[in-house]
A protein has these predicted regions:
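OB-fold/S1-family RNA-binding modules
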Residues: 1-69, 74, 156-185, 193
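Conserved glycine-centered short motifs in functionally critical loops
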Residues: 63-185, 193
Length: 193
């Protein structure tokens, strides 16, 4: 538990009692943050946790604009590509690229926290001609990363549309903690805010 955690909801009575007893003994100032979840709607359904877990293992993550990001971890770095599948006929191509890149910046920051990916990360944003659009995307990326507890360094978008960044890993990445073909222990998932 940390100061920035608002509350911990537990949907099993015996587990709730065990956790509450532990917190009372070890960190009593956090006792009021432990809550028993009693709603009829299952806890994971209420907060759409299953969907977040599913996206954490997918190579491609869809964006609200129908674009997507493709995340490829390699030995040397994490490569992230942004794709716009939105039709551009009748639309301003530059505006479509900007909006998709802004959405991608937020989702990338979320996915990096969720998967706890670290090291060198190279993001291939959709090409944008105006420098002001590039600065806007860089700023959105920095803002989206502000809540990350890991140490992060973000560069500028290059003339090739690439943004380099580094992120400190806080624990083994989600892909590394996953047992081969077995279920993922939910207690180890770093859920984003």
């Amino acid at each position: 538990l940390r100061q920035d955690i608002g509350e911990v909801q537990i949907d099993a009575g015996t587990v709730y009692e065990d956790v509450l007893n532990f917190v009372r003994a070890v960190m009593p100032s956090f006792e009021n943050k432990i809550k028993l979840y009693k709603d009829e709607i299952p806890l994971f359904s209420r907060y759409q946790i299953e969907g977040q877990i599913e996206t954490a293992f997918q190579r491609e993550v869809m964006l609200p604009s129908c674009g997507s990001i493709v995340i490829d971890p390699t030995e040397a770095l994490v490569s992230i590509d942004i794709n716009s599948s939105r039709a551009t006929k009748g639309h301003d191509i530059e505006e479509t690229a900007l909006q998709t890149n802004l959405e991608a910046a937020e989702e990338i920051a979320r996915q990096l926290r969720l998967r706890d990916m670290g090291g060198l990360i190279v993001i291939d944003f959709i090409d944008m001609t105006p420098a002001k659009h590039q600065r806007e995307v860089e700023q959105k990326m920095r803002e989206a990363l502000e809540i990350d507890r890991a140490r992060v360094q973000v560069g500028k978008i290059s003339r090739f549309g690439l943004l380099e960044m580094s992120r400190q890993r806080l624990r083994p990445s989600l892909g590394e903690t996953r047992s081969e073909g077995g279920p993922v222990p939910v207690t180890h998932l770093p859920l984003p805010p």
